[in-house]
Amino acid sequence: MAKVCYFTGRKTVSGNNRSHAMNQTKRTVKPNLQKVTILVDGKPKKVWASARALKSGKVERV
């Protein structure tokens, strides 16, 4: 199972670090994902949920 938010689809994205000389090196920006248990078809299931989804109330925990 990939580390992608079950509700919002947020996942790791890539970007660049920039120095004062404007040199660039690759970096990754990771979302704040938490493992939560939810009910799917009446059965408990563990999924990754972003902190933003948890705070906004999109997640109904068991």
Swiss-Prot record:
Family the entry assigns: Belongs to the bacterial ribosomal protein bL28 family.
CC terms in the record's Gene Ontology section: ribonucleoprotein complex; ribosome
HAMAP family per record: Ribosomal_bL28 (MF_00373)
Record-given protein name: Large ribosomal subunit protein bL28
Pfam families: Ribosomal_L28 (PF00830)
BP GO terms, sorted: translation
Entry keyword set: Ribonucleoprotein, Ribosomal protein
